[in-house]
Amino acid sequence: MGGQGTWHIGLHHPSLFAALAPQAGWSTLHVYQPFAMQPSRMFASPEILLSRERARHDANNLFFLENAEHLPVIITQGAKDKTVPPMHARLFQKLLEIRDYRVNYRELQDKAHWWDEPRSEGGGSDALDNKEIIEFLRKQKREIPNSFKIRLYDLSLNDRFYW
């Protein structure tokens, strides 16, 4: 699930993490995979459409962005990404900054969705084993906030937080 999984799990369970480091994560399923012209939408009954919309609402990461209030975020995005276009990462950055949340944004101009360049030290791919991201994450600590707001969609999925 990559960047999408990072956003989804991190924003649904913010107390489990000290920070988030999504890479190429989409903002909302409706933008990533438009469904307006799909035959299943055009020919479905209103009842089916309503059920489908309710099920898909949980895939709207922007709805849950408020849950990042106490999570520092480092976003990495390839500027040449055609799988998850950079507009998603830029939107996250902008919305986090508007809220005064802690966000670092890295848009790599010559990179696409994935790159296999080796790290300068040791093995692995720089796409995953990036020194800047790892150092950012090592500096973070989970702290109990004095106050918080949580945005939930389904209490049966995430109704407990360590704070």
Model features per residue range: what roles?
Residues M1-G3, Q23-W26, Q109:
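Short, solvent-exposed turn/loop segments enriched in Gly/Ser/Thr/Pro and often Arg
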Residues K82-H88:
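Conserved alpha/beta-hydrolase "acid-adjacent" motif
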Residues D58, H70, H88-R102:
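Active-site neighborhood of glycoside hydrolase catalytic domains
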Residues A68, I74-Q77, D81:
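Short beta-strand/loop motif that positions the catalytic acidic residue
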Residues H12-E66, H70-L71:
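Mobile cap/lid helix-loop segments that gate and shape the active-site cleft of serine hydrolases
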